[in-house]
Amino acid sequence: MLSRFVVPTIVLAASMFSLPARAQNTPPTPFPAPDPGALPVDQSQEKHIDGWYRDVPVPPKDQKAAPAPRHDLSGIWEPAAGWRDGVQFLGAKEYPSDGKHILPFTPLGEKAFKANKPGFGTTEVPIALNNDPFDICDPIGFPRIELFNLRAIQILQTEKQVLIFYQNDRTFRSIWKDGRQFPSQDISEPRWYGYSIGKWEDDTTFVVQTAGLDARTWIDNVGRPHSGDLRVEERFHRVSHDILELTLTIIDPTMYTKPWNALSKFPLRLQPADFDLREMLCSPSEQAEFDKQVSRPAIADSKKK
């Protein structure tokens, strides 16, 4: 079971607290900090295996693209540039928390953002102060499930629904395409993954609207907030038989002065039909062990200073 890299996180976090505290006038840097002298990873040279420990063939670069089928998103998909492309540990792909990509916060949105204490990005805090709800095994929720650790997904279609099964958190979403509207203007029971309805805009573009999202979730891994008024639009455009592009737009006038694209034509590649999705789960027992070995000692250490 791939449990959100709990063991590597323990090692990294433990090493972090053995380092001297940052000077107060030193701006925070993303953790773990990249090695400026490291060569870029060529993911095409990595051995790629699925959840069944079987090799996944790398498609030939000169392979001619077959046309996209009509009204069909079904299949198993992974980030076309390699699994690292979907990690997004510094936040949404189009707006990483790097001090350069500034979101259009409302005053309330900025206040809510500052109240969130992530372990990554320009507002990162020591692990003792982190308040990421996913770190206590709350459901990751939507849209964060597509904006953090977007790995393999499997899309199934029925007459009335499109179902998306995610490797991350081993969960799924139902998207109704039978013409229904949202339950009401004021959805009284928000959901971790919201209420989703979709329709075909043309032969190869499926547009999804999602509302009724639980405001306790974060939009991404660096604590971008949302309100109960959040609407998310996804555009799944099947460019060819093997490539699917995903654009995800955040619409929340309570927190942001205008809509913004968290993903823009993010490419996913079709995998073989016998590709097995790995298991990635937040385990409460492993999280408890992490707290025992890392979080509690860090909190105790911070109180001594």
Question: Which stretches of residues belong to each language-model region?
Answer:
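PEST-like low-complexity, intrinsically disordered acidic/proline/serine-rich tracts
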Residues: 2, 21-305
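Bacterial N-terminal signal peptides
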Residues: 7-18
